[in-house]
UniProtKB/Swiss-Prot annotation:
One of its GO terms (biological process) is translation. It is found in: Plastid, Chloroplast. One of its GO terms (cellular component) is chloroplast. This is Small ribosomal subunit protein uS7c. InterPro entries: Ribosomal_uS7, Ribosomal_uS7_bac/org-type, Ribosomal_uS7_dom, Ribosomal_uS7_dom_sf. The keyword Nucleus does not apply. The lineage of its organism: Eukaryota, Viridiplantae, Chlorophyta, core chlorophytes, Chlorophyceae. It holds the Pfam family Ribosomal_S7. One of the primary rRNA binding proteins, it binds directly to 16S rRNA where it nucleates assembly of the head domain of the 30S subunit. Part of the 30S ribosomal subunit.
C-alpha cells in the first residue's frame, strides 16, 4: 500500500465566454506571473481573429487544431541492460495527451518572434488547423521515434496501429 496519499484529480471549469474547458486550459498555459486577465485577453483576441479569418466558430477551429496536434503515443526512457531505450506507449485521448498538445502549441508561439502574442497564438492555431507548423512537426517526430522503437514496447503492434489510425 502506498504511504503517500493519492491526489484527487481537479476538475476544470469551462471558461466564461466560450464555455469550453479546452479554452480554459489554453488560458492557464498562456498565463504568466499570475496575470490571468492578461491571459484571457490574449486568448480571446486570438480566437476572435481566428473567427474573422476562417468565418467559422473559433472554438471549433481551436478544438480541431488541438485534435490535429494531440499525440496518440508517448515515449519514455527506460534503462535496460545498461542502455537507455525509448519505450513507446499508447496515450488515451485524455488530459496527458491534451496537455502535450497545448505545451507544443505554446512552445511554437515562443519560437515565433517579432510579433505580439495574440498574432503568434492565432498563427500557430491556424497552422495546427491546416496540419502544418511546429506543433504538428513535433507530433510527427514523436510518432517516428515511437515507430522506430516499437520493438521495445510490450505490444508493438498496438503502438503501430495507434499511429496508423491517424494516417487513415
Amino acid at each position: 500500500m502506498p504511504r503517500r496519499p493519492i491526489n484527487k484529480k481537479r476538475t476544470l471549469l469551462p471558461d466564461p465566454v466560450y464555455n469550453s474547458v479546452s479554452v480554459h486550459m489554453l488560458v492557464n498555459r498562456v498565463l504568466k506571473s499570475g496575470k490571468k486577465s492578461v491571459a484571457y485577453r490574449i486568448v480571446y483576441n486570438a480566437l476572435k481573429e481566428i473567427g474573422d479569418v476562417t468565418q467559422k466558430n473559433p472554438v471549433e477551429v481551436f478544438e480541431k487544431a488541438l485534435d490535429n496536434v494531440t499525440p496518440r503515443v508517448e515515449v519514455k526512457p527506460r534503462r535496460r541492460a545498461g542502455a537507455i531505450q525509448m519505450v513507446p506507449r499508447v496515450l488515451r485521448l485524455g488530459d496527458r495527451a491534451r496537455a502535450n498538445s497545448l505545451r507544443w502549441i505554446m512552445e511554437a508561439c515562443d519560437k515565433r518572434s517579432g510579433q505580439p502574442m495574440v498574432t503568434k497564438l492565432k498563427s500557430e492555431i491556424l497552422d495546427a488547423y491546416k496540419k502544418t507548423g511546429f506543433a504538428i512537426r513535433k507530433k510527427e517526430e514523436l510518432h517516428k521515434i515511437a515507430i522506430a522503437n516499437a520493438m521495445y514496447a510490450k505490444k508493438p503492434q498496438v503502438i503501430i496501429n495507434a499511429i496508423n489510425l491517424l494516417v487513415d
